Structure formats: C-alpha cells, structure tokens
From Swiss-Prot:
This is Formamidopyrimidine-DNA glycosylase. GO terms for biological process: base-excision repair. It comes from the Bacteria. InterPro entries: DNA_glyclase/AP_lyase_DNA-bd, DNA_glyclase_Znf_dom_DNA_BS, Formamido-pyr_DNA_Glyclase, FPG_cat, MutM-like_N-ter, Ribosomal_uS13-like_H2TH, Znf_DNA_glyclase/AP_lyase, Znf_FPG/IleRS. A zinc finger (FPG-type) spans 237-271. It comes from Wolbachia pipientis wMel. Its cofactor is Zn(2+).
C-alpha cells in the first residue's frame, strides 16, 4: 500500500502537471471500488479547474475552482498514471480524468481497494475530522509524541500506525523509523522516555523525508504517475530483510506479526 511518502510524491507530481488545468470529462469504467465512486462525478467536475493539490495522510486531494474536491486513496495496488488522451486503456483503468489540453490522469487499481469520491468543502472537513497529526509538521515533536503515547496501552509500532493519532506512517516507515531510533517495536508505547520520544519523532521525520526525496518505495505495485519507480527500498535497514544481516551489527533481522502486520527489526540494535 502506498504510504505517506508515495502519496506526497504523487501529489507533488500532479501539482506540477495538472494545476490550473480544466477537466473536460470524467470516464468511469468501473463504479465499484471499496466504496462506490461518487454518482454524477462527470457532471460535478466537467469544466472545473484544478486549483490546488495536497496530501492528507495517504489521500491525495484535488481542490477545484468550484468548491468541490476530488479525494483519492490508492488502496493496496492503485496507481495514478499521467498520459495523453489517446493512450491505450488497460484492464484495470477504472477512472479516467480528461483535461482540456489532451492530457489525462488514469486511476488504475487491480485489487479495487482504492477510493475516488467528490466532496464539497464541508464534507471534506468532516471526512478528515478524526485524522491525527501530520508527522512532517513542526507541531510533531518529542513533546507532542510523549503526550500522545503516555496513555497508550499498545506496542509502539501499533501506536505509530494509528491513523487517529498520527497519519501516514504505515508498516514500512514505522519499521524503518523504529530501527533508526533504536527502539524495539515490542516496547509498550506508554513506557518510552522523553529522550526516546524526541529521537523517534526526529527519525520519523527523517525517514519520511528521505523516502520522499527518493521518490518513494517501489516493492510491487507503486510507481510515480510518470511510470518511474521509487528507490527508497534500496535504503531499507530492516523492512523485508528477514534472515539477512543487520547493516549495523550483522545480527540476523527478525520477522514477527503484530496486529496481523509484518514487523521487521534487529533485536540487538533495538531495545
């Protein structure tokens, strides 16, 4: 699943390519994703101009001049593809946004866990109302993290992946950030010291920023709208490295399951 860095890379690409473009048509080839695509999406968006593109958590948001926004989540396997109008369509191209300059954005999603909806400003505010803090903001700090975690009765990795507390830190970047901070994913969240919270907050920011600079992580499905792969996976310390030596100490990387998700860590470096 694309996480915060991948969606940030996608949103930045789209901001450069489709800001101030007018939507001429929206073609829906499959209405049934994880939730139905907004009815009358073509009528709602036809003639609208894209004024801004931003990210919230793992969602990319296209604000238009018509007080409505397109909200897209890529699910497990979704992609947004930048193409000309006449590019040959593929089997899983569920939604095609056509622009007046003969370019298009194609939403392709083989597993159909993605989301494409249109909301007005009030609906957009309500939709994101229970989302947690953005980890790349100045407000996200050691002080904030310690206050957030002090009553959490879960392990630290699960706490980091709670979207109502912190958005966008998915499985990959939780594992990598905890390694960089030298904190075991098995630790109780509420027992982290202030110094550990300070270190962890910094390493979450560093890990996410490094991943964005690398174009994200391409493991299976993710690609940038241009078709280019990300390469942050080449810099992983622990994720996907089960039974391989730790880059720091040569101890063998451990794989466990936490809340149904794979967790990778070095039990020598992380405590």
């Amino acid at each position: 699943m694309p996480e915060l860095p991948e969606v940030e890379v996608i949103s930045n690409f789209l901001l450069d390519k489709i800001k101030n473009k007018q939507i001429s048509n929206v073609i829906v080839n499959n209405w049934n994703l994880r939730a139905p695509i907004t009815k009358n999406i073509d009528d709602m968006l036809k003639g609208k101009v894209i004024r801004n593109i931003k990210r919230r958590g793992k969602y990319t948001i296209w604000n238009t001049d018509g007080s409505v926004a397109v909200i897209i989540h890529l699910g497990m396997s979704g992609k947004l593809i930048y193409a000309d109008h006449d590019q040959m369509r593929n089997k899983h191209d569920h939604v095609v946004f056509l622009f007046s300059d003969n370019t298009s954005i194609i939403f392709n999603d083989p597993r159909r866990f993605g989301l494409v909806i249109v909301l007005n400003k009030e609906q957009e505010t309500d939709f994101f109302s229970d989302f947690g803090i953005e980890p790349l903001t100045d407000e996200f700090s050691g002080d904030y993290l310690q206050e957030l975690l002090k009553n959490k009765k879960v392990n630290i990795k699960s706490a980091l992946m709670d979207n109502k507390s912190i958005v966008g830190v998915g499985n990959i970047y939780a594992s990598e950030s905890l390694f960089r901070a030298r904190i075991s994913p098995l630790r109780s969240a509420k027992n982290l010291t202030y110094r550990e919270c300070e270190k962890l907050a910094a390493e979450i920011k560093n890990t996410l920023s490094d991943a964005i600079a690398a174009g994200g992580s391409t493991l299976k499905d993710y690609a940038q709208p241009s078709g280019s792969a990300g390469y942050f996976q080449n810099n992983f310390y622990v994720y996907g490295k089960v039974q391989k030596p730790c880059k720091i100490c040569n101890n063998i990387i451990t794989l466990i399951r936490q809340n149904g998700r794979s967790t990778y860590f070095c039990n020598a470096c992380q405590n």
